[in-house]
């Protein structure tokens, strides 16, 4: 864990990062509006989308033992289970018995494309994510089957070699009394070199509750962040930058978090070739 220092170099880097976050915040606010419009567009189509996905399915797979990761075993993010503790994809079940209790049901079409994901509770689909393919974009519409509403959106963009370039997730407000509102957005961007995955940038937007924010600030008023000490503007968007390193066999074995207070090196939580 880094220690906060207040050298001129560190202060300048902190200011630069906050300026970057403020600019990214403007982008995320525009994304909020775009994604809210996307929710409104798909909401009247949910039943048809779900029925079409189920009808097109020719094969199913099941998984369990996942924890804290989007879409379970088939999470699009190449980095979440490398850098987040307690985050795991789970495992695919080779056979199904009467005692099997899977977490997810994956539906594939005749082109072997994942077209829907059911989140299961005692074999009942409580949520269904429908995947829509448009050129290099795959949109995931996550539906609450109880009230037929959209609870999450995801967007994956791929390059011509089918490598994922970016992965976005957005949480839709559960307050049905208001117009469609996006509460949280996380955007991951990836770059590659001859070794494989090289860098990841993670941009997170969370619309903070000002009451809770003030309570937290007060509780830490004797241990202020450098941003607070410098009087920098508050920002609902945070930015993280990761560099990945590969061993001689091509596996990611460690990563570095680029930080104004000093870069931090960690061992990858699992070894994988990407």
What does each of the following model-derived ranges do?
Residues 2-274:
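Buried hydrophobic residues that stabilize the cores of well-folded domains
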């Amino acid at each position: 864990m880094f220690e906060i220092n207040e050298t001129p170099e560190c202060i300048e880097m902190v200011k630069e990062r906050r300026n970057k976050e403020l600019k990214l915040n403007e982008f995320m606010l525009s994304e909020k509006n775009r994604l809210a419009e996307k929710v409104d567009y798909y909401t009247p189509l949910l039943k048809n989308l779900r029925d079409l996905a189920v009808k097109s399915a020719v094969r199913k797979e099941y998984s369990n033992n996942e924890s804290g990761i989007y879409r379970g075993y088939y999470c699009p993010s190449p980095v979440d289970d490398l850098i987040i503790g307690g985050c795991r994809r789970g495992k695919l079940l080779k056979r199904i018995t009467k005692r099997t209790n899977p977490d997810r049901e994956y539906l594939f079409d005749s082109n072997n494309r994942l077209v829907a994901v059911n989140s299961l509770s005692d074999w009942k689909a409580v949520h269904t994510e429908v995947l829509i393919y448009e050129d290099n974009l795959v949109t995931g519409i996550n539906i609450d089957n109880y009230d037929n509403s959209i609870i999450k959106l995801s967007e994956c963009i791929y390059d011509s070699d089918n490598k994922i370039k970016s992965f976005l997730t957005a949480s839709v407000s559960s307050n049905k009394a208001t117009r469609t509102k996006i509460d949280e957005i996380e955007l991951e961007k990836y770059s590659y070199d001859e070794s494989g995955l090289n860098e990841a940038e993670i941009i997170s937007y969370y619309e903070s509750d000002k009451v809770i924010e003030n309570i937290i600030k007060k509780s830490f008023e004797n241990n202020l962040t450098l941003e607070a000490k410098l009087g920098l503007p508050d920002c609902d968007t945070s930015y993280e930058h990761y560099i990945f390193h590969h061993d001689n066999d091509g596996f990611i074995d460690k990563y570095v978090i680029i930080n104004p207070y000093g870069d931090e090196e960690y061992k990858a939580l699992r070894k994988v070739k990407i």
